[in-house]
């Protein structure tokens, strides 16, 4: 039996409503998909992670695979992470960094352990509904802290779709990790209170993950994960 037109349309809309984070660039230049970003498992289907205890919650990779290249950026500068086609769902954009230990190769390092510190999270605008500035956008500037040590880092981009998050396990995580070489840094190492592991940073019951954003409309929002590290 041939599938109905309505089923085909639903499938097409479902795919188009999802997205990836395949590129990162500095200055005004653009880069190829997955050039500096580790190719995520959703590179073909634009899917999402819904299990916060899965290994995919780290960089959306079931099997480790490095990026083609590592992007060199100066500490204190702003770079841009790109979505494809664009963020479609309401929810926060968040960014984490993890420094590759001295003596290890960024291409083989997986980012395991309590090494991730948050450098940005998005708060909504409150009113008759929650409004997220990331919704509908395809590029996201993120500033590299000026005080952190120079070295090799993974930059983890994460958008959490909260449109159906009133049920446990229904929040949608869109994730990828870029490879950076940060130069001209300072001497600061974020403290243990800022660092988390993936998996381990989130619980499915966290108030910023298990939440009904539609009714009653929340008057506050607590981002999942640690506090944002600042210099």
UniProtKB/Swiss-Prot annotation:
Subcellular location: Secreted
EC class name: oxidoreductase
MF terms in GO: metal ion binding; monooxygenase activity
InterPro entries: AA9, AA9_LPMO
Cofactor binding note of this UniProt entry: Binds 1 copper ion per subunit.
Any single GO CC term annotated in Swiss-Prot or TrEMBL for this entry: extracellular region
Alphabetized UniProt keyword annotations: Carbohydrate metabolism, Cellulose degradation, Copper, Disulfide bond, Metal-binding, Monooxygenase, Oxidoreductase, Polysaccharide degradation, Secreted, Signal
GO biological process: cellulose catabolic process
Signal peptide feature range: 1-17
Chain residues that bind Cu(2+): 18, 50, 89, 174
EC number: 1.14.99.56
Domain of life: Eukaryota
Cysteine disulfide links: 59-177, 147-231
Sites where the protein binds O2: 50, 163, 172
Function as written in the Swiss-Prot or TrEMBL entry: Lytic polysaccharide monooxygenase (LPMO) that depolymerizes crystalline and amorphous polysaccharides via the oxidation of scissile alpha- or beta-(1-4)-glycosidic bonds, yielding C1 oxidation products. Catalysis by LPMOs requires the reduction of the active-site copper from Cu(II) to Cu(I) by a reducing agent and H(2)O(2) or O(2) as a cosubstrate.
Protein name: AA9 family lytic polysaccharide monooxygenase F
Organism, as annotated: Neurospora crassa (strain ATCC 24698 / 74-OR23-1A / CBS 708.71 / DSM 1257 / FGSC 987)
């Amino acid at each position: 039996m041939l599938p109905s037109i309505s089923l085909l349309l639903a499938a097409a809309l479902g795919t188009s409503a999802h997205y990836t984070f395949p590129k990162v660039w500095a200055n005004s230049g653009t880069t190829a998909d997955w050039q500096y970003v580790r190719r995520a498992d959703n590179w073909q289907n634009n899917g999402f992670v819904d299990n916060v205890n899965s290994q995919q919650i780290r960089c959306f990779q079931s099997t480790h695979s490095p990026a083609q290249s590592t992007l060199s950026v100066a500490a204190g500068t702003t770079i841009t992470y790109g979505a494809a086609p664009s963020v479609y769902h309401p929810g926060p954009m968040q960014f984490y960094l993890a420094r590759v230990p001295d003596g290890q190769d960024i291409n083989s390092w997986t980012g395991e352990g309590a090494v991730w510190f948050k450098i940005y999270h998005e708060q909504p605008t409150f009113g008759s509904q929650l409004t997220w500035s990331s919704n509908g956008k395809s590029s996201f500037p993120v500033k590299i802290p000026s005080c952190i040590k120079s070295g090799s880092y993974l930059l983890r981009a994460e958008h959490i779709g909260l449109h159906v998050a009133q049920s446990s396990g229904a929040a949608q995580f869109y994730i990828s990790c870029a490879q950076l070489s940060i130069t001209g840094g300072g001497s600061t190492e974020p403290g243990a209170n800022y660092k988390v592991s993936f998996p381990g940073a989130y619980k499915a019951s966290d108030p910023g993950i298990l939440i009904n954003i539609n009714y009653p409309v929340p008057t506050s929002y607590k981002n999942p994960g640690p506090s944002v590290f600042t210099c």
